[in-house]
Amino acid sequence: MNDNYMINPKKELSQCFIHSTDITDKIVNYAGNISNFSIIEIGPGLGTMTYSILKKNPKKLISIEKDSRLLPIHDKIIKKFQGKYEFILSDALDIDLRNIAKPPVKVIANLPYSIATLLLIKWINYINFFHSFTLMFQKEVADRIIAQPNNKNYGTLSILTQLFADVYKMQDFGPEIFSPKPKVFSSVINIVVLPQPRFDVNYDKLRKIVKITFNQRRKMIRSTLKQITNNTDEILHSLNIPNNLRPENLSIKQFCDIANCI
């Protein structure tokens, strides 16, 4: 694949290519058995991860890539793995993944960091479509996704993801595995979707409450909740939640309980 290296990564697309198949093989292995799954890859780049996925014989692999310069590389892969590989030239933010793959579905990707959080929030809206995600994030974002209450990283991403899934950090990686080398460390995490949400709650209402409270995370919840309801003190008292807590002190269940009272 040495000829592929002549493609210069585009900064505006957050392109950081992984060249080592040892690394991509390891990432794909974190996804477990994929032989009975449709796999979706976002930002396949030079195809290193693509080859690692196809070597494990998925039911089908569908890649979404925005950079048309990479099309010739993936045309070669399509010819080599006839019927197993589909390449879509598009922006992943514009695609509803339910329209391109048949369940069960796993997503395996080295996500473009500039849109990684936006993609995850988008997928959470129809998360029951997926079995799991094995994703490379900027380490700072990964730490937010897996964070627990009473941690400075705990926030909107933690709550909205963990309401629907178990989350695990698999491995941290330094900048040296990428070309060009980013200025940040990266982490691979597994997000394994639960059969049902942990708690029964109106998701849109929960998301609104979480967003408002964590936008002012240093304020006590009795203050920020007043932007949503006039019954803040009564609600907190009925739920035995001290009104001097900050949002990072509340569990996912407590946020759901509050949402169910509003």
From Swiss-Prot:
The keyword Cell wall biogenesis/degradation does not apply. One of its GO terms (molecular function) is 16S rRNA (adenine(1518)-N(6)/adenine(1519)-N(6))-dimethyltransferase activity. InterPro entries: KsgA/Erm, rRNA_Ade_diMease-like_C, rRNA_Ade_Mease_Trfase_CS, rRNA_Ade_methylase_Trfase_N, rRNA_adenine_dimethylase, SAM-dependent_MTases_sf. Keywords: Cytoplasm, Methyltransferase, RNA-binding, rRNA processing, S-adenosyl-L-methionine, Transferase. It catalyses: adenosine(1518)/adenosine(1519) in 16S rRNA + 4 S-adenosyl-L-methionine = N(6)-dimethyladenosine(1518)/N(6)-dimethyladenosine(1519) in 16S rRNA + 4 S-adenosyl-L-homocysteine + 4 H(+). The keyword Cell cycle does not apply. It comes from the Bacteria. GO terms for cellular component: cytoplasm. It is found in: Cytoplasm. Its EC number is 2.1.1.182. SMART domains: rADc (SM00650). Specifically dimethylates two adjacent adenosines (A1518 and A1519) in the loop of a conserved hairpin near the 3'-end of 16S rRNA in the 30S particle. May play a critical role in biogenesis of 30S subunits. Belongs to the class I-like SAM-binding methyltransferase superfamily. rRNA adenine N(6)-methyltransferase family. RsmA subfamily. This is Ribosomal RNA small subunit methyltransferase A. It comes from Ehrlichia ruminantium (strain Welgevonden). The lineage of its organism: Bacteria, Pseudomonadati, Pseudomonadota, Alphaproteobacteria, Rickettsiales. The gene is rsmA.
